[in-house]
Amino acid sequence: MRRTLLATLFFLVLIAIWHFLVQAGIYSPVLLPSPQSVGEYLLGAARDGTLLQATSVTVRRLLVGYFIGILIGLPLGLFTSAFKFVEDTIGVMALGLQTLPSVCWIPLALLWFGQTESAMLFVVIMGTVWSVVIATDTGVRNIPPIFARAAKTMGSRGLHKWTKVILPSSLPFLVSGMKQGWAFAWRSLMAAEIYVTILTGFGLGHLLHYGRELHAMDQVIGVMLVIIVIGLLTDKILFSPVERFLHNRWGTGLR
């Protein structure tokens, strides 16, 4: 309760400082709209359906690209940890590509797929898959050796060993990798939606782009706040409960 009150007070102070900067004329309302202006935009966009439609389009793209990235990254990570040749090739490539900013994939996506939905999905997948590969590989390699020896002593080999020992033991690393992959996917999609203009549906990134084009800073900041809230809700509703479960079950994790 005390933590909630302190956090609420902190954000109220931030809003008060924001309001003061606008009212004191330190920043022009054109560059920094007041909290009231941003709130009015969000209410208007919610009432006419613009915000809901853009959010649903963005979340749908994110989920599709993210899960495809997991389906590709998880097996690749397992192969990387199991075979030396794959580690020296796919593993090195994954490590290098993870450091590449997601926005760098946009020119390739536009050249290969054009102004299409596939271009944005490609950028999201590229932002996700390499984090999952590295996290899976790291998770398998950080399993306590005693687990592997005990499994071998008890006759666990092959698929049984992987499904009953290796994967469960590496779950904390896998969840961390999926969480990181989600963050990279989210950023990748925002960059893609800002740069890729398509007619199949306008997402939150498009609202950011058009807000900038129209110098509507209330729209830009309002959409940014929506993006932040979605990210926080995803962490609290999806990843935090899983991390708490892993901590209680195995004594690992961050919480």
Which residue ranges define each predicted feature?
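Transmembrane-helix boundary motif in ABC transporter permease subunits
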Residues: 64-94
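Transmembrane alpha-helices
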Residues: 122-126, 158-192, 226
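Periplasmic/extracellular loop-to-transmembrane helix junction in inner-membrane transport proteins
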Residues: 24-67
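Short cytoplasmic-facing helical segments at TM-TM junctions of multi-pass membrane proteins
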Residues: 135, 139-174
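Generic hydrophobic transmembrane alpha-helix motif, especially the helices
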Residues: 95-131, 138-139
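N-terminal signal-anchor transmembrane alpha helix
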Residues: 2-26
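Glycine-rich helix-loop "coupling/hinge" segments at transmembrane-helix boundaries
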Residues: 111-112, 188-221, 226-227, 251-255
